[in-house]
């Protein structure tokens, strides 16, 4: 930081330059420097309850309800209006008429 000012009245041409030391500036800078300490979020883990059913060892052949996707229709749209989906609906076996517990 430099300060420059003329000495005496306007007719004189001498100037004095005052330089401040950087040590005092750096000390005040270190004091005003804030440090933020961040804590990591706790690790989220899946926890199973006692009432959780194990589907892997229940001798089920498959866990999917049905392998064919049925497109949702609007309320006023009939099922006979579908274009090419009607062919795929006929290939669905009787597995879709029963729920997953009845098929097991």
Swiss-Prot record:
One of its GO terms (molecular function) is protein serine/threonine phosphatase inhibitor activity. InterPro entries: PPI_Ypi1. One of its GO terms (biological process) is mitotic spindle assembly checkpoint signaling. Residues 78-88 have a biased composition (Acidic residues). Its main location: nucleus. Keywords: Nucleus. Residues 10-27 have a biased composition (Low complexity). GO terms for cellular component: cytosol; nucleus. It is found in: Nucleus. It comes from the Eukaryota. Residues 1-41, 74-104 are annotated as: Disordered. Pfam families: PPI_Ypi1. Belongs to the YPI1 family. Regulator of type 1 phosphatases which maintains protein phosphatase activity under strict control. This is Type 1 phosphatases regulator ypi1. It comes from Schizosaccharomyces pombe (strain 972 / ATCC 24843). The gene is ypi1.
């Amino acid at each position: 930081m430099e300060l420059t000012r003329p000495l005496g009245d306007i007719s004189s041409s001498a100037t004095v330059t005052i330089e401040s030391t950087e040590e005092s500036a750096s000390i005040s800078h270190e004091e005003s420097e804030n440090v933020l300490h961040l804590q990591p979020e706790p690790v989220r883990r899946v926890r199973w309850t006692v009432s959780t059913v194990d589907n892997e060892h229940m001798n089920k052949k498959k866990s999917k309800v049905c392998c064919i996707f049925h497109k949702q229709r609007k309320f006023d749209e009939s099922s006979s209006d579908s274009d090419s989906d009607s062919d795929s609906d006929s290939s669905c076996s009787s597995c879709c008429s029963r729920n997953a517990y009845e098929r097991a």
